[in-house]
């Protein structure tokens, strides 16, 4: 069924789907600059980019995220007959690619990142859409707690570079050795308060009791305020691991706070979990989050005991924060606007511009037969560095005037791409 409405003249106006958004010129430049800045930070930290398909087997997410999670139970876009799903997050897809392509053979420790769209059938709200974009960063093959601290330091660098105020909150979820002991203590605590919990938490208390700590319902939050902390139940190895993470962050002078309620919404997390929180979007919001998942690679068919850790940054919330700050990134200007006056001159403009683009010059040409005045307005609006005007006289002489739009200085140049390129370089000095 088409999503839209009928206009007065009987034509159908098709609209974007609820929870989806067009990113238009004027805004997309901000996205491009953010991606450019973050890619630079990731590559400086020795991460390589990987790109995976959007569509994956449903079982991949059921096995990794957890069948009892809200994402798998309520939020995935699944083609039930084909048993395939539009990815709701990137970690599982990245690990599938890591295993399937044997990346662990070529390099024992893989440092990977990906940027792209994810899909969840949630209630659309500020900074949360049904198609949303994430930057996902993963380290596979290292259990060293210094890697945990390095990832959080890199995340802090991203937000600091973009001028976004965040605070870092952390917790540890222990391991298969110590978490069951804590789980039992939490279940006993919840049982005494069961009747005061929301329906979702009553269900979670049976299937995944740690998620009760993560409930946003004010009544539930009040009930679990005095819940035991998992940090008091960590085994020796997990306690040492978390202590190293904390002391390393202190050495790096990265502020953090402990949050015993942080359990994350995905079942695969263990040990270190963390979130970057901002208060600048109204309600408290996480703009980046992640943690360690030392059993996930093996669970999905990868090498036994292969550890991993990663985090994701939500692009939509990042962009909202930058727009609220009225942050402006200057888009790269075109180098040249070639103005053609008449059919023959416009054809020559087309040929010259293509030759110049081959030399790395950004060129704009108007093909609509506008006047000189109108094309000069277009050139000014485009913010080009220079203009080149072609008419009958220029075609006859094989020369034209190149004008610097900032200094208004002019020079005569032969209508040869190499000569124009050299003149542009001189004009820019």
From Swiss-Prot:
InterPro entries cross-referenced by the UniProt entry: aa-tRNA-synth_II (IPR006195), aa-tRNA-synth_II/BPL/LPL (IPR045864), Anticodon-bd (IPR004154), Anticodon-bd_dom_sf (IPR036621), His-tRNA-ligase (IPR015807), HisRS-like_core (IPR041715), HisRS/HisZ (IPR004516), HisRS_anticodon (IPR033656)
Keywords for the protein's UniProt record, in alphabetical order: Aminoacyl-tRNA synthetase, ATP-binding, Cytoplasm, Ligase, Nucleotide-binding, Protein biosynthesis
Family annotation (Pfam families): HGTP_anticodon (PF03129), tRNA-synt_His (PF13393)
PROSITE patterns: AA_TRNA_LIGASE_II (PS50862)
Coiled coil residues, start to end: none
Residue stretches spanning the membrane: none
Entry's Gene Ontology BP terms: histidyl-tRNA aminoacylation
NCBIfam families per record: hisS (TIGR00442)
PANTHER family named in the record: HISTIDINE--TRNA LIGASE, MITOCHONDRIAL-RELATED, HISTIDYL-TRNA SYNTHETASE
Protein name in the entry: Histidine--tRNA ligase
Source organism (scientific name): Desulfotalea psychrophila (strain LSv54 / DSM 12343)
Gene it is expressed from: hisS
């Amino acid at each position: 069924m088409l999503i839209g409405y009928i206009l007065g003249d009987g034509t159908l106006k098709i609209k974007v789907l609820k929870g989806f958004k067009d990113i238009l010129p004027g805004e997309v430049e901000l996205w491009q600059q953010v991606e450019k800045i973050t890619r630079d930070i990731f590559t400086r930290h020795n991460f390589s980019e990987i790109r995976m398909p959007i569509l994956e087997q449903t079982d991949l997410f059921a096995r990794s995220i957890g069948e009892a999670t809200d994402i798998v139970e309520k939020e995935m876009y699944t083609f039930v007959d084909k048993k395939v799903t539009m990815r709701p997050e990137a970690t599982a897809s990245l690990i599938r690619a890591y295993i399937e392509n044997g990346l662990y053979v070529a390099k024992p420790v893989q440092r990977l990142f990906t940027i792209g769209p994810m899909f969840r059938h949630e209630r659309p709200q500020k900074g949360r859409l049904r198609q949303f974009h994430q930057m996902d960063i993963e380290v596979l093959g290292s259990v060293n707690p210094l890697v945990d601290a390095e990832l959080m330091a890199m995340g802090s660098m991203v937000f600091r570079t973009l001028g976004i105020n965040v605070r870092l909150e952390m917790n540890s979820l222990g391991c298969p050795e110590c978490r069951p002991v804590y789980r039992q203590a939490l279940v006993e605590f919840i049982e005494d308060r069961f009747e005061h919990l929301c329906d979702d938490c009553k269900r979670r208390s049976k299937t995944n009791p740690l998620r009760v700590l993560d409930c946003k319902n004010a009544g539930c939050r009040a009930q679990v305020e005095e819940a035991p902390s998992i940090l008091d139940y960590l085994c020796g190895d997990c306690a040492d691991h978390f202590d190293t993470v904390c002391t390393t962050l202190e050495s790096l002078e990265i502020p953090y706070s402990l949050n015993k309620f942080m359990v994350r919404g995905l079942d695969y997390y263990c040990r270190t979990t963390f979130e970057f929180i901002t208060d600048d979007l109204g309600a408290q919001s996480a703009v980046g989050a992640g943690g360690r998942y030392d059993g996930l690679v093996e669970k999905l068919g990868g090498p036994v005991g292969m550890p991993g850790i990663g985090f994701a940054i939500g692009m939509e919330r990042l962009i909202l924060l930058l727009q609220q700050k009225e942050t402006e990134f200057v888009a790269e200007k075109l180098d040249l606007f070639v103005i053609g006056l008449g059919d023959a001159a416009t054809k020559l403009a087309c040929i010259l511009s293509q030759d110049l683009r081959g030399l790395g010059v950004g060129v704009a040409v108007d093909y609509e037969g506008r006047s000189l005045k109108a094309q000069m307005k277009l050139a000014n609006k485009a913010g080009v560095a220079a203009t080149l005007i072609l008419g009958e006289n220029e075609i006859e002489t094989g020369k034209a005037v190149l004008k610097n739009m900032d200094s208004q200085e002019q020079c005569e140049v032969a209508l040869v791409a190499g000569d124009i390129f050299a003149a542009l370089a001189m004009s820019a000095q």
